[in-house]
């Protein structure tokens, strides 16, 4: 079938109008010498021929229009606006896609996701220094995706553009554990990044953030995790109920390491490892709901008097703390936030539907905040008008509340796959 195409428009762009094809059975053409001759090619007849001509012409016009479009820009990265105290990092271990850990940056005021980091296998969480210019992320990768040679690194991200700007290779020993706040931490001056290892021998990797080099490994046999107490000091919790207090030199080597007395009754009422810090004091809750303040001193760590989170009547009603990150603190207001639920012994990982708020001076509950969804992780911003962030492994969403009134504000839903630890910059 032969179809006459429309002429090009005078300007050379776009498409001209299309007239119906003639219904003659034969067409007449002119030879190169100008002699008219009859063509043996059959022309399309009637409405069918017209439709075919229109379709072909339209396709040609579409191709012409596409060719005239300017190319889309690629590789453009928009910098973030100035950081807000209401931003929060939502770490996602991605249980259903384990090699593909992620960290999402969310603006609590707008409920919008500002950016995302791809953070590798068995991801435990990012670390945000006080200076806010960079983000540190301990990560693991395998040469064949889910197998092959393992490489552990600390990836350094620009906190404004969320792009990698450096990488420090570390020994492939980083603990592949359920994400928890104590798995990695910076010393108080942001100089050294400490990363918990479990092979099953327990140790800490030390990274100098100034020189961007691996410094060495510190043995913490029988103890776990890392809780900073100063520019060069931190402690780990030991299996016998004691603490291992370590002091570093300016080169990141061990200057002093000593065990305290056993502060914790590990047989009758052990602590969870999910502590929160206010000033020089770390606060830990026991399985039975007793709060243990551990205060750093120039010579080590001392245990201040404990106090109960639950009254005897509440204990008979089986109220317990529980969750993956079940405590949060607002330092300025002196408030402790705790996820609670009703359950029996060994339910310290269960999700909760309420947040109980305590005054850290009077040791009394002053507020109860009902959650819209069961939650396992909470975090509170540290500004004068704080937000309360809440999420859980079971619901890939982030709920946001006014931390003062307890009023629900908004949700980011969905968000990731299995959100875990929350970090405020």
Label for each model-derived stretch:
Residues 69-71, 112-118, 163-175, 213-218, ...:
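A short beta-strand motif characteristic of beta-propeller blades
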Residues 71-79, 121-130, 175-185, 221-231, ...:
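Repeated scaffold domains used in trafficking and secretory/extracellular systems
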Residues 82, 88-95, 138-151, 338-352:
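Short, conserved, GDST-rich strand-edge loop motifs in beta-rich repeat architectures
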Residues 84-86, 131-133, 189-191, 231-232, ...:
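Short coil/turn segments that connect the beta-strands within blades of beta-propeller domains
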Residues 94-97, 141-145, 200-201, 241-243, ...:
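Short glycine/acidic-enriched loop and turn motifs that connect beta-strands
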Residues 108-110, 159-161, 208-212, 248-251, ...:
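Short loop/turn segments that connect beta-strands within beta-propeller blades
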Residues 161-203, 213-225:
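Asp-box/WD-like beta-propeller blade repeats and closely related beta-sheet repeat scaffolds
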Residues 319-360, 368-383:
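Loop/turn-rich, solvent-exposed surfaces of beta-rich toroidal or solenoidal domains
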């Amino acid at each position: 079938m032969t179809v006459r195409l429309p002429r090009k428009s005078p300007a050379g762009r776009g498409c001209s109008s299309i007239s119906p094809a003639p219904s003659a059975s034969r067409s007449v053409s002119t030879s190169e010498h100008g002699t008219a001759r009859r063509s043996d090619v059959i022309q399309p007849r009637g409405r069918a021929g017209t439709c075919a001509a229109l379709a072909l012409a339209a396709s040609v016009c579409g191709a012409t229009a596409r060719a005239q479009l300017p190319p889309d820009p690629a590789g453009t990265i928009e910098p973030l606006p100035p950081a807000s105290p209401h931003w929060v990092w939502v770490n996602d271990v991605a249980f259903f896609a384990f090699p593909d850990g992620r960290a999402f940056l969310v603006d609590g005021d707008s409920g919008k996701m500002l950016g995302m980091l791809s953070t590798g296998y068995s991801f435990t969480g990012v670390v945000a220094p006080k200076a806010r210019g960079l983000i540190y992320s301990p990560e693991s990768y395998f040469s064949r995706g889910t197998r092959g040679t393992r490489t552990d690194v600390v990836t350094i991200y620009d906190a404004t553009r969320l792009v990698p700007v450096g990488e420090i290779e570390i020994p492939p020993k980083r603990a592949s554990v359920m994400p928890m706040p104590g798995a990695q931490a910076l010393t108080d001056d942001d100089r050294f990044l400490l990363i918990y290892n479990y092979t099953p021998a327990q140790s800490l990797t030390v990274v100098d953030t100034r020189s961007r080099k691996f410094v060495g490994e510190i043995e913490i046999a029988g103890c776990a995790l890392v809780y900073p107490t100063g520019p060069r000091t931190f402690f780990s919790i030991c299996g016998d109920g004691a603490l291992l207090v370590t002091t570093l030199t300016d080169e990141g080597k061990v200057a002093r390491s000593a065990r305290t007395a056993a502060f914790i009754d590990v047989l009758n009422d052990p602590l969870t490892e999910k502590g929160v810090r206010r000033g020089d004091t770390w606060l830990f809750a026991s399985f039975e709901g007793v709060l243990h303040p551990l205060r750093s001193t120039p010579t080590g760590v001392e245990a201040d008097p404990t106090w109960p989170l639950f009254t005897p009547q509440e204990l008979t009603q089986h109220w317990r703390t529980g969750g993956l990150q079940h405590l949060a603190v607002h330092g300025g207001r002196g408030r402790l936030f705790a996820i609670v639920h009703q359950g029996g012994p060994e339910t310290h990982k269960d999700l909760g539907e309420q947040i109980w708020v305590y005054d850290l001076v009077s040791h009394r509950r002053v507020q109860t905040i009902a959650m819209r969804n069961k939650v396992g992780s909470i975090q509170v911003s540290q500004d004068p008008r704080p937000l309360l962030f809440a999420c859980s492994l079971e619901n890939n969403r982030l709920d946001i509340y006014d931390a003062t009134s307890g009023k629900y504000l908004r949700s980011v839903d969905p968000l990731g796959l299995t959100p875990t630890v929350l970090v405020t910059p």
